[in-house]
């Protein structure tokens, strides 16, 4: 499914994908949800998507990465959807941004994207500033979600740790061990996201406005502190 929004002359519009034509003075946000090769083909041709980037957004298994191309920049991130029992559910969210457009691609419902689409006023305000501001907004929401998950995990681990001190039974020890593995997996995801966020803090010709750099530095700081918090807890466990 493809949703396309444009902003020009102070007006936000939703466009029929079959009528899409790229215009220089118009900003675009294209959201691809569970899209296939045929759906992406027209978008690829209009926005000069590199074959490597196309391959990445068609896969739900691509690792977190940042890659600059001549016509645009691709950002692929693996986020944490939720944690069930001790299993981390990972999902991919892909971004491709160019001079006046942002393309998002995902295979699962995304709360931040759905919320933005259902809030035309918010979307209009972001697109008025430029498509890069939508990218910043969505990335910020993803890191916020990771911070919330980290806080929940650390609190659960502390509670299990206290329980083990009071009742050092095998079952509690196994629970503690499983939670440690979950923390380790979460840290690995966060380390990749932190490296990604760091890439966005450096001035380059990557089609992002330099005025956004301070905001990306804030996101990096939040991601870094989340990663360090997980490292600290794991260090205490193993130390």
Predicted features and spans:
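A short, structure-level motif marking secondary-structure boundaries and short turns
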Residues: 24-26, 134, 171-172
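Helix-boundary and N-terminal cytosolic regulatory elements
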Residues: 1-129, 192, 196-208
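Long, non-coiled-coil amphipathic alpha-helical linker/lever segments
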Residues: 124-142, 146, 208-215, 219
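Membrane-associated alpha-helical segments
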Residues: 100, 142, 151-152, 158-239
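A short, ordered amphipathic alpha-helix with a cationic face
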Residues: 29-30, 125, 149-151, 187
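Short flexible/disordered coil segments
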Residues: 90-93, 118-137, 165-168, 227-236
